[in-house]
């Protein structure tokens, strides 16, 4: 068997070299310590377009709250979103829950064991189906994500780069697959792309399969991604709530994003208000943050505001709600809202570090979801 420009012997040698490297160097990640297809499914959905470091912060708590597929299926959407908060791309969480409900209702509560059947579930495409099937069930089907696409394009010397070669890679990856350890081999290919065969400045001298690569050492540094910028302003509105046990609890006003919003639909955040060109009539913001989502930097200012200063009810159809601080952890908040509330010391039990008053554009912290 040969794979493109590789002979049958080279394919066997490449597999062996890659697996030896992976066994010695793979990262110790919680979803690699389990053979539970459900846990692997959750991890793969979280890892879509999200850094491993960000997933690690949420995976353990999500699995602790939803340890089984049945638990997830029986939980409200808002609670699932609350435990997803900070990961972004919230449609993934909605589809994950929807798919869990489908499996319980139509599959007897058992996740299908083949990539073909997995693709019929909401939110599961070719990549995710192959990952679950190979890692969770041992099906010999190749995974092709961005990392594998880049590795295969360089390894085979395919012309035109990853985008142009995308149609050729799945078949090549399938022929290269180690059928004895398909799940580990797929993870090894992805690990190689994540740690060694980087988009810019690939570490060719450290690559375990460099002798088989047709483009080793030829890669130029990719230009820096151009980021767009947008300013956004939020109101921090507080009031003393009803008397309880002799104390009046502080309540915060939250606003729900529209269900048809392109980002974070249906999530809760602090009310958005028009930008204050002169610092809200002389007031300085309580907090300023830079918040990066995909290719846009959002420069967010948070001003203390009275409820009477907000116009109307936030526009037609806008839903607002007063909540106590103790209710915040169970709310499906946007990642920016959750982190801002912690920085503002409004999160229950969170003292945080001292937050200086910042002038717009100065001393900005970066928050990436």
Per-region residue spans from a language model:
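Catalytic cores of DNA base-excision repair glycosylases
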Residues: 3, 8-12, 16-219
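Intrinsically disordered, low-complexity, charged terminal extensions of DNA damage-control enzymes
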Residues: 1-28, 33, 194-369
């Amino acid at each position: 068997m040969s794979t493109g420009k590789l002979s049958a012997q080279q394919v066997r040698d490449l597999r062996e070299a890659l697996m030896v490297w992976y066994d010695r160097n793979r990262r110790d990640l919680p979803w690699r310590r389990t053979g539970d297809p459900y846990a692997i499914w959750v991890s793969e959905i979280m890892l879509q377009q999200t850094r491993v470091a960000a997933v690690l912060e949420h995976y353990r708590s999500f699995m602790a709250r939803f340890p089984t597929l049945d638990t997830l299926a029986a939980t409200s959407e808002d609670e699932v979103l609350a435990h997803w908060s900070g990961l972004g791309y919230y449609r993934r969480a909605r589809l994950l829950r929807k798919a869990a409900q489908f499996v319980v209702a139509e599959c007897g509560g058992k996740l299908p064991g083949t990539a073909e059947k997995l693709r019929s579930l909401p939110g599961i495409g070719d990549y995710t189906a192959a990952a679950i099937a190979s890692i969770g069930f041992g099906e010999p089907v190749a995974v092709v994500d961005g990392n594998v696409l880049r590795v295969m394009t360089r390894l085979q010397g395919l012309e035109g780069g990853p985008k142009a070669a995308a149609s050729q890679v799945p078949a090549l990856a399938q022929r290269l697959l180690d059928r004895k350890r398909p799940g580990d081999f797929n993870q090894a290919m992805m690990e190689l792309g994540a740690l060694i065969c980087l988009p810019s400045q690939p570490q060719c001298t450290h690559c375990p399969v460099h002798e088989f690569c047709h483009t080793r050492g030829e890669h130029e540094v990719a230009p820096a991604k151009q980021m767009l910028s947008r300013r956004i302003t939020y109101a921090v509105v507080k009031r003393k709530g009803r008397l309880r046990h002799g104390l009046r609890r502080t309540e915060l006003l939250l606003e729900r994003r529209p269900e048809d919003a392109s980002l974070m639909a249906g999530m809760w955040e602090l009310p958005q208000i028009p930008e204050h060109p002169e610092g809200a009539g002389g007031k300085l913001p309580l907090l300023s943050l830079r918040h990066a989502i995909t290719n846009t930097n959002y420069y967010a200012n948070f001003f203390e505001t009275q409820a009477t200063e907000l116009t109307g009810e936030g526009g037609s159809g806008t839903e607002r709600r007063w909540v106590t601080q103790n209710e915040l952890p169970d709310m499906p908040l946007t990642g920016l809202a959750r982190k801002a509330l912690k920085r503002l010391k409004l999160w229950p039990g969170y003292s945080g570090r001292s937050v200086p008053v910042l002038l717009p554009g100065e001393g900005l912290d970066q928050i990436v979801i």
